[in-house]
Amino acid sequence: MATVNKAHLEFCSSPEWARLVEDELLPWVLDGCELGDDLLEVGPGPGLTTDVLRGRTARVTAVELDLDLAGKLAARLAGSNVRVIAGDVTRLPFPAGRFSAAACLTMLHHIPSPALQDAALAELARVLRPGGVLAGSDGLDTPARRELHVGDVFVPVDPGTLEGRLRTAGFGRARVDVAGDRVRFAATR
């Protein structure tokens, strides 16, 4: 089941996006976040974020809803420190406290309702170890972003409510920052 249109997927697979991820997005999002040795990444899409994350921790488990994207990413990263699973972030197949950290990068807006977004946040809190951090980012609602998402799922996250939503999901401390047309968040279980 695809949650992105063709143009969006092409951009998220492009060298331009890879450069933005490595040089700007991940340094900003991960600033001050300790990933530990066992990272869960949800919604990696074609995996350009995964490519950077796998160099920052011993193990990465990537959960992707789209079966085709999950299969391609698993094939591309076979033999690496990344395990790719096709699955739903609102129903993760892992025991409580399994991961040292989680990354949720530019994907929350692809979850089709705030209630399901909250279910995803609660699942992420559940599978994190005590003291584990969720590091994430998302794009704000802009005309350009709406245009990029024509024909796919786009439910923007309100940064004004995100800290409270993270706490309700089971996180103790939460930080939310807005810069330009992006929001980053870090929450500790």
Where are each of the predicted segments found?
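N-terminal, positively charged/glycine-rich alpha-helical extensions of SAM-dependent methyltransferases
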Residues: 1-9
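C-terminal alpha-helical "lid/dimerization" subdomain adjacent to the S-adenosyl-L-methionine
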Residues: 12-13, 17-18, 133-186
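Conserved alpha-helix/loop element of class I SAM-dependent methyltransferases that forms part
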Residues: 18-37
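Short glycine-centered segments of the SAM/dcSAM-binding site in methyltransferase folds
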Residues: 38, 132-133
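Class I SAM-dependent methyltransferase SAM/SAH-binding core
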Residues: 40, 45-91
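A conserved beta-strand element that flanks and buttresses the S-adenosyl-L-methionine
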Residues: 103
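Short catalytic micro-motifs in class I SAM-dependent methyltransferases
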Residues: 106-110
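A short glycine-rich, Lys/Arg-flanked "PGG" loop and its adjoining helix->strand segment in the class I
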Residues: 118-130
